[in-house]
Every structure is written in C-alpha cells, then in structure tokens.
C-alpha cells in the first residue's frame, strides 16, 4: 500500500468521530468491516496474511526479530493485531490458540518478494518454537504447518479421503 493511502485512510478514519460517543463494540473492534471492499487497498494482487503464535519464553525476542525482518524487507502491514493468549492448552485436534503471544499481519502480495518475506518470518517462528495459523496461511512451508499442528496425525484418523483442500494438499506434499 502506498504511504499516502495509509495516511489518507488514517486521517479520514480518525476525523470521522467528533468528541466522545457511545457505540457498540463491534464496529469499534472491527473498523475495516465498515469500509466496503477494504481489501482493494492492497491493489490488484490482493494480500496475504501471516499469523503466528509464539511461546511466552521466546515471544519478546521473536517479535523483535519478526518486526526487524519486516523493516529490513522494506515492507509494512496496513493492519497488525497483537494478542496474548491465555494459559489453556489447545482444545481441538487442529486448534491454533495456545499459551503465548499471537501476531497477525497483512502484506500486499508482490510475488517472489512476498514469498521470501513469509519464508524469512516462518524461519523466525520455527526458531522460536512457535506455530503458524493454517486457516490464514497461503505461503508457509508444509513442514512448519505440520509442526504447527501437533495433533495432526490424531486428526488424520478421522479424515475422509474423498474430501480435499489446498491446505491438505500442502500438508501431504513432501511427506
């Protein structure tokens, strides 16, 4: 996204409200939902999202490394979401949430340049013993995806081979 687009959006968004107002939490917490076709801000090629969860012990240095890598790649994210997950273990066989910090970032898709960035971010996540959110992933390595799903083999016992998806084809690749 061009810097002037981000500046214009931020200026318009923050000027729209005058004074204090009471409002429902939904539009406050999901501001992009109020903008029709917001995904077009990323251009014709769209965007990819990278979301990871980092264990508490490695979260801070890994976050610094992720942000440093993004800066060195001269990239930025129009939308960033940082949350701390609680201490409950994953409940489902393919659950993403687990104790730690999660960071979600949107990047305009720029072909090989974006693929290299995601590969570099994934290396940091793997080194930190983190995980990738498969439901939001389009570019991560199959091995890291498998590591992100520690109960995948248990889930496979219930899988119907007649059903398939891009995620499953990627997970089965290079096995």
Ranges and model annotations:
Residues 1-175:
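Noncatalytic alpha-helical scaffold of FAD-dependent oxidoreductases
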């Amino acid at each position: 996204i061009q810097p002037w687009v981000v500046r214009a959006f931020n200026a318009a968004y923050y000027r729209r409200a005058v004074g204090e107002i009471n409002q429902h939490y939904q539009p406050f917490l999901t501001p992009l939902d109020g903008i029709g076709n917001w995904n077009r801000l990323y251009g014709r090629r769209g965007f990819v999202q990278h979301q990871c969860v980092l264990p508490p012990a490695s979260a801070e240095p890994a976050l610094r490394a992720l942000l440093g890598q993004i800066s060195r790649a001269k990239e930025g994210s129009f939308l960033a979401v940082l949350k701390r997950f609680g201490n409950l273990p994953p409940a489902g066989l393919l659950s993403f949430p687990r104790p730690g910090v999660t960071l979600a970032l949107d990047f305009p898709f720029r072909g090989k340049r974006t693929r290299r960035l995601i590969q570099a971010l994934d290396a940091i996540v793997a080194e930190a013993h983190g995980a990738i959110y498969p439901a939001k992933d389009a570019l991560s390595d199959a091995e890291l995806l498998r590591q992100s799903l520690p109960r995948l083999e248990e889930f496979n016992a219930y899988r119907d081979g007649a059903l398939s998806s891009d995620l499953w084809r990627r997970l089965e690749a290079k096995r």
